[in-house]
Amino acid sequence: MTVQQRSFLGRALYVGPSMRTLHEQYAKHGSVDAGAPVLASCEVTVRAPSSEVWELLADIARWPSWVPGVRQAHLDGEPAPDVPFRWVLNGMRVKSTLAVVQPGSELSWTGTLAGTRGVHRFLLEPAHGATRVRSEESIGGPLAGLLYSSDKLQAVLADWTGALKSQAEKTG
């Protein structure tokens, strides 16, 4: 049964996988939670090599300088699987853990925000001298569908990938 087929109450009360399961079974294995009540994806082509796009994404401490809504970001070490990081998005504190760190091709993490659990993936693919960037995210947990909407998440992903494109093309 798809999220759209579930009743309002079913979407509102969706608990979904534990954070550990989301991290180990979903994010590390190339997927978001397709059953989550909040899902979105966005794709953009950036006129810059994937190495330059990667440098922007992987430098989490610099996110506040170019990612809309991010005011603080701190990584506890070098980017690597299972390394935690904390950041502030639109005034809300997010606790995240990197799941996949494949230079030039994928940066994925799991995180918690206001009682919700999310999986976020950035996928980079070379495309004739440019880079195709796909961003996808799922947000689940009790009341996630009431606190947030797929449309709102779609707008956030579009803003983020748009800023990534602008920043990478400016430096590239």
Model-derived features: where do they sit?
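Compositionally biased, charge-rich terminal segments
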Residues: 1-5, 132-136
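Glycine-rich portal/gate segments that line the openings of hydrophobic small-molecule binding cavities
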Residues: 8-14, 45, 64-65, 74-119, ...
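Short, conserved loop/turn and helix-capping segments at secondary-structure boundaries
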Residues: 57, 114, 150-154
